[in-house]
């Protein structure tokens, strides 16, 4: 039996995975910023900017929380782990200095941009899920602004930037894959 893949409708489990992983990502971002601000306080060179980004991520997370509740989507079982890991990543990069904190933001947001773009491509294949599509488009633009602001704030001047950025991006890709399923 062959299947027509010309305009495949995303199945409910696929949409639930999208919502689950996106909520987990936004939650993780809030924890990264909390960790950075715990180290930098409100006097660091980028503290106000980080606090603003954190507030935006809280808004994103709240909207995904609401969508999960509406649709009965379970959160990732790894949320407690992502809470600790995100906070540790934020605090650790802030301890390396303000440029490293910005490198963390740039790396994470680069991966989230790619991830959201992949999801939007999948949703565009079908035309289904206009509410989810609009949210992802809006949030992707915010994440791009965060990435660009981090780069403008000196992310690439962080110690061992290519290595730091590469490791963070690899960790993000792994977290995305795991959170889709678990």
Where are the regions a protein language model picked out?
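Non-heme di-metal
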Residues: 1-182
